Amino acid sequence: MPSNIYHTFEKKSYKIKNKLLGDHKIHNLWVLFKNKKPVAAIVETTAPDGYSGAINMLVAAYFNGEIINARVLSHKETPGIGDKIDLSISNWITRFTGMYVASIEDKDFKLRKYGGKIEQFTGATITPQSVTNSIKRTVVFIKKIPFIFDFLNKGIYEYQKFFK
């Protein structure tokens, strides 16, 4: 998340576990507040199905489904092909900023090759599709946070029943 945006919010951190985040591990979650009201979140997430293994990411979005930012934290993708998900290699990941995710069934939020509106990069399909799917699942999760906020404040970190 750009520092000029990040520093305009108050933040509270939580631990969370949910299948929409790509694995069965506990992930960090930061709820962002504006005027003492929760408005967005940053979530650590995993794209488990990258070409060369799991891709760890941060996704930030408003509760209405608008993506603030997405960044890859770590990956083992093929140099010169799949590694274009990394901001230090390519700006491909920045195309998600400002996009909206309507639902898990959002037909537009997939690669153009599969009928969606997102351009992949040359030479790779699996890696950009994995990242795209992970961002979509994570934003769907973020959109549910207002419904589980009371549970978060009670220290309950696993919410499978809310996300079926």
UniProtKB/Swiss-Prot annotation:
Keyword annotations: Electron transport, Flavoprotein, FMN, Oxidoreductase, Phosphoprotein, Transport
Cofactor needs: FMN
Classification via InterPro entries: FMN-bd, Ion_transpt_RnfG/RsxG
SMART domains in UniProt: FMN_bind
Oxidoreductase as UniProt keyword: yes
Modified residues (FMN phosphoryl threonine): T125
Record note on quaternary structure: The complex is composed of six subunits: RnfA, RnfB, RnfC, RnfD, RnfE and RnfG.
Entry's family note: Belongs to the RnfG family.
Full protein name: Ion-translocating oxidoreductase complex subunit G
